[in-house]
Design a protein with these regions (language model features):
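Catalytic histidine neighborhood in serine/cysteine hydrolases
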Residues: 190-207
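Short beta-strand/loop motif that positions the catalytic acidic residue
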Residues: 166, 172-174
């Protein structure tokens, strides 16, 4: 199967819709089929009344791929979405050709709720105003109960336990100024991957795919081409 025939599936982060994936998706769409999903209960996707766990969100993405007739894809995720995609890559390795984790949460050495919330708030000040406005709108659309419940689900998930089980070649990417995932955490996560590589985008925050879509897309293209034989 040619590289160009394998679609890209983009999964958003915590309490935000897929809208902030558009700058990256637009660059991808010049040559590839691209799908930017809204997870259940976020953005334009209706969700169940209960809050879904990370494994349940991964199952939902797998079911969506099956319904869409997508047998394999290049998975790209940010923040919370990295946990969902890591779980998916372990549960259904045959569906994932390559995996790109942008600003994965959570720092394996800092699972404490207060520590992570403080880091998220600190990073939010480095994000563009338009993105913060987008997040605020999506927060209220998702609702307080789902926002808090999903945040708790993210903190209770230990991505470091899944990383060694991922067979797909994995690109881990972070913005240099991302306070939610220090360089030490990114290096530790990369070392847990069987086929992992780390790329750092200079001067960028947590949502580096939004602020630096060109650099992120170039890194993803290089990653895909390395494993397109």
């Amino acid at each position: 199967m040619a590289t160009g025939s394998i679609p890209f599936v983009l999964i958003h982060g915590l309490v935000i819709s897929s809208l902030y994936m558009i700058p990256l998706a637009e660059r991808m769409a010049e040559e590839h089929e691209v799908h930017a999903l809204d997870l259940p209960g976020f953005g334009q996707s209706e969700g169940p009344s209960e809050v879904l766990t990370i494994p349940e969100l991964a199952e939902w993405v797998i079911a969506w791929m099956t319904a869409m007739g997508i047998e394999q894809c290049h998975l790209v995720a940010n923040s919370l979405g990295c946990e969902v995609c890591a779980q998916l890559a372990v549960e259904a390795p045959e569906r994932v050709v390559t995996l790109t984790l942008i600003g994965p949460t959570i720092d394996p050495k800092a699972h404490a709720f207060g520590v992570q919330v403080a880091r998220l708030l600190r990073d939010s000040l480095r994000e563009p105003f338009r993105l913060r406005l987008n997040w605020t709108f999506d927060f209220f659309r998702a609702g307080l109960r789902r926002a808090i419940g999903t945040t708790r689900a993210m903190f209770r998930y230990y991505i470091e336990q899944q990383l060694p089980q991922i067979a797909a070649p994995t690109l881990l990417m972070r913005g240099e100024n991302d306070s939610t995932e220090p360089q030490s955490a990114a290096l530790a996560m990369t070392q847990l991957l069987v086929r992992g590589r780390l790329v750092v985008i200079a001067g960028a925050p947590h949502c580096v795919h939004y602020t630096n879509p060109r650099e992120v897309w170039e890194a993803i293209q290089d990653h895909v081409q390395r494993h397109s034989a």
